[in-house]
């Protein structure tokens, strides 16, 4: 389990564990944005967990890793950290975060690399949503609905709205729809 110490915060974690979470979340990071802070990962340490969040104009995704922490911390980490981690073999990493100057030092066996983080305050906050309708379903039923229409979703960077599945509720049912512009699923 990763550990975090006082002073300059230290996160010890498996390279593959961290890389897997960052790669999952990287799909949400825009290549260009009018809000540059969303081109970063948000690292938050709360209640013994490291939460990693990405956001764009359409939403946000959060993943978490267990850790031991003596205090909470929040910092934005450049997406370029992913490129540095990809080149390393599996090994324990020690990530040192200086909350004062936002410097981030990643040490590994035989080397280190540094990046400069950013204050987390400008990162988009989670929006509070009003629950208008509630339908209960199992994860298996939900996954089944998505798997039936996902093949109809496009993978087109020029029309990102076609790269998704629309989920609507009507009369107590969940309706899953996707389209690539040629077929409807």
Residue ranges and their predicted role:
Residues 1-185:
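Structural preference for solvent-exposed beta-strand-turn elements
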């Amino acid at each position: 389990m990763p550990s975090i110490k006082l002073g300059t915060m230290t996160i010890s974690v498996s390279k593959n564990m961290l890389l897997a979470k960052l790669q999952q979340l990287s799909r949400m990071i825009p290549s260009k944005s009018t809000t540059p802070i969303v081109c970063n990962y948000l690292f938050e340490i709360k209640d013994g967990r490291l939460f990693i969040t990405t956001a764009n104009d359409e939403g946000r995704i959060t993943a978490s890793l267990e850790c031991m922490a003596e205090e909470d911390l929040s910092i934005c980490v450049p997406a370029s950290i992913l490129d540095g981690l990809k080149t390393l073999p599996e090994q324990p990493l020690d990530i040192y975060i200086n909350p004062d100057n936002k410097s981030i030092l990643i040490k590994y066996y035989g080397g280190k690399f540094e990046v400069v983080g950013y204050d987390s305050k400008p990162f988009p906050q989670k929006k509070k949503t009003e629950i208008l309708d509630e339908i209960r379903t199992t994860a298996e039923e939900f996954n089944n609905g998505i798997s039936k229409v996902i093949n109809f979703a496009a993978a087109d960077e020029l029309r990102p709205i076609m790269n998704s599945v629309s989920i609507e509720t009507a009369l107590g049912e969940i309706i899953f729809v996707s389209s690539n512009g040629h077929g409807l699923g």
